[in-house]
Amino acid sequence: MSSYKTRVLAAIEAHCGEAFPADTALDLGAGDGWYASQMQGRGLAESVQALEVQLRRDALVEVALYDGRHLPLADRSVELVYAFDVLHHCVDPLAVLDEMMRCTDRYLLLKDHTFKSRLDRWTLATFDEIGNRRFGVPSPRNYQRGWGWVDRLEAGGFERCTLVSPVELAGFPLGLLANKLQFIGLWRRQ
């Protein structure tokens, strides 16, 4: 497995421990299912449902398809909803974030990106293309500018438990450009 994903999971465990163990979790944008398998395998979640807009042949867990807009879950039906490096791939990240808020009963966990300058956005777009093109994952470049997603969560009745940025996920020399653009955040329904 990629050292990047391993570092992401280690950072999430280090900074978001109050959300674990969860009885039920939703892995939104599950990709190959690695995070879902690790969440269960490490005892961070008892049961994980994995959703994705396109299936991958190499999936490690059962992944269900969804339309990329409406999550096929009832309101407040899972204890933890998470998306790792997913929202910026969505056509409408705020609408998907609203769906995540609707479906969680307790915690919402994000690992994604934020940018301030044109150079930051260009850096994210370049890394996104390099990292995702081989999987056929579109990169619409819908990155969070500043903290708009955070504002949406907190206006939607969620209390910030932790927000970490920058996050040391990429080694030298890429980390000089990439780490300042990374964030991990955990919110709890009020």
Language-model features and meaning:
Residues 35-37, 41, 113-175:
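C-terminal alpha-helical "lid/dimerization" subdomain adjacent to the S-adenosyl-L-methionine
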Residues 1-12:
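Class I SAM-dependent methyltransferase Rossmann-like catalytic core
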Residues 85-86:
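Short catalytic micro-motifs in class I SAM-dependent methyltransferases
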Residues 106-114:
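Conserved beta-strand signature within the Rossmann-like core of class I S-adenosyl-L-methionine
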Residues 31-70:
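Class I SAM-dependent methyltransferase SAM/SAH-binding core
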Residues 82:
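A conserved beta-strand element that flanks and buttresses the S-adenosyl-L-methionine
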Residues 22-31:
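Conserved class I S-adenosyl-L-methionine
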Residues 90-100:
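A short, conserved alpha-helix within the catalytic core of class I
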